Amino acid sequence: MQNRPLTIGLVAGETSGDILGAGLIRALKAQIPDARFVGVAGPLMQAEGCETWYEMEELAVMGVVEVLERLPRLLKIRKDLTRRFSDLAPDVFVGIDAPDFNITLEGRLKQRGIRTIHYVSPSVWAWRQKRVFKIGKATDLVLAFLPFEKAFYDRFNVPCRFIGHTMADAMPLQPDKLAARAKLGIAADARCLALLPGSRGAEVEMLSADFLKTAQLLRTRYPELELVVPLVNAKRREQFERIKAEVAPELRVHLLNGQGREAMIASDAALLASGTAALECMLAKCPMVVGYRMKPFTFWIAQRLVKTPYVSLPNLLAGREIVTELLQHDCVPDKLAASVMPLLEDSPQTDELKQTFLTLHQSIRCGADEQAAQAVLELAKA
């Protein structure tokens, strides 16, 4: 055992985890070139040299029905991984995101004396806060993207390290707006608004009509307003086009396949659903309004479960409302348009907002891959 190379177990459950895992492996190999990586890996992690025992897609299930259908298989995989990692006894096991799968696995491995890390904090600070106790028992360390996440874990004496956000590392502090416009075919002097009604089908269904009606109202004020709508895949594009044909068939918009980041950088303002898109928009230095609606019963439940004063990451990072959030009954075209309109004007307020975005960007731009690798190595030597 003493002569073997540093051995790291990893399990990633979806594409975002594969990206994080690949970055972590790269950073570890830069320090320990002969380290061995094994577990459940996507194509990017495999390209960096990680052996995989199962295809990552086996773990990538979404929605209650799909999870229930696949549950016997998922439980079988987790049992087998527990056995394999117990036999292998890696120096450290890193569960990358996929908390419903990984945290239980981490707990079982920790009971067997294997050091465990959970990479990417679940949103325990926002809802189902009691999960923090399970996480504390299951892991030796949580790696958190955001400083308020570490502050939350500190309250419960759960070891946590703030490593910064990989997206903040990937995006420049000063984005090139003119280059983004040239790429998307938008004139340098045009006034431009990005509409981002979400990446999930339910979000696109709930928000697209009101976002389009908002754009119509703004067009009466700014007749030459350019509208760009990046959609994550062909399914969401088809869905959006159907809604647009019903709600605003005459409205002129540029539909984009993906290219959400370019659209944000190119635009003067954005109207978007909450989620990671709001963080990305902040990093793009694009002033935004967050609009979000759920089914009434879901919203009723969320109001009782969610423990944070804001829903968008820019506001949570700032600790105050720097971005307008219009939720549920407030997410209507006249209110959305009234909030977006000032952002389309050059003003000291929008300049100040962009400066705040820059300050927040710098606060979470810490070299996350390298920080994560350092945490793994320190735990391996502990």
From Swiss-Prot:
It is an enzyme of class 2 (transferase). Keywords: Glycosyltransferase, Lipid A biosynthesis, Lipid biosynthesis, Lipid metabolism, Transferase. The keyword Acetylation does not apply. InterPro entries: Glyco_trans_19. It catalyses: 2-N,3-O-bis[(3R)-3-hydroxytetradecanoyl]-alpha-D-glucosaminyl 1-phosphate + UDP-2-N,3-O-bis[(3R)-3-hydroxytetradecanoyl]-alpha-D-glucosamine = lipid A disaccharide (E. coli) + UDP + H(+); a lipid X + a UDP-2-N,3-O-bis[(3R)-3-hydroxyacyl]-alpha-D-glucosamine = a lipid A disaccharide + UDP + H(+). One of its GO terms (molecular function) is phospholipid binding. Pfam families: LpxB (PF02684). GO terms for biological process: lipid A biosynthetic process. Its EC number is 2.4.1.182. One of its GO terms (cellular component) is membrane. Pathway: Glycolipid biosynthesis; lipid IV(A) biosynthesis; lipid IV(A) from (3R)-3-hydroxytetradecanoyl-[acyl-carrier-protein] and UDP-N-acetyl-alpha-D-glucosamine: step 5/6. Condensation of UDP-2,3-diacylglucosamine and 2,3-diacylglucosamine-1-phosphate to form lipid A disaccharide, a precursor of lipid A, a phosphorylated glycolipid that anchors the lipopolysaccharide to the outer membrane of the cell. PANTHER family: LIPID-A-DISACCHARIDE SYNTHASE, LIPID-A-DISACCHARIDE SYNTHASE, MITOCHONDRIAL-RELATED. Belongs to the LpxB family. This is Lipid-A-disaccharide synthase.
